[in-house]
Amino acid sequence: MSPTPFNELLARQVGNEFAASQQYIAIAAWFDGQDLPRLAKHFYRQSLEERNHAMMMVRYILDRGIKITIPGIEPVRNDFTTAEEPLVLALAQEIEVTDRIKELFAAAREENDPLGEQFMLWFLKEQVEEVASMSTLLNVARRADNLFDVEMFLARERVGDHGGGHGGHHGHHGGGHGGAHGGGHGGGTHDSGTPEAAGGSL
């Protein structure tokens, strides 16, 4: 199968997802260094989630019989002066990803590619939750008297965790991808809310 504009955009999005994963690791490490373990854990988990979004896309491209070249990524931001800065960056990143997923969905529809359209529809729904969760976290941080209030909020509300899987709301996906792609690729159990199998977790 020859690459189409949709497939070329999707291949580029693989790089964007890996870049988002790396940025979340950098944010998590910064919070870790500030002795804010729940914020750190939240973003380590977000990093894993973005990585596995990328792997889902890689698996999809390969399953469609298309060769893929994994793109490189730009350096990420590691230094922040306030705790609000990484949260603002994270929200902006999720909004940018949402815009790119919308572009992918539109490209699949333009090409009359129902498989691509269905695949991207899952990511669109995911991004609604991701943007909402990150917006909530940023708003809580801005209203909190101190960062330990944010830590307690994360412990109480499990923002971005959602019970550890997409079967309930939205959590992390793990590295394996089976189920929807026939026969399975990697290990794990199938979460009812995802088009893929979830392979490892934190």
Regions found by a protein language model. Give the residues of each.
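Iron-associated oxidoreductase/ferritin-like identity signal
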Residues: M1-L202
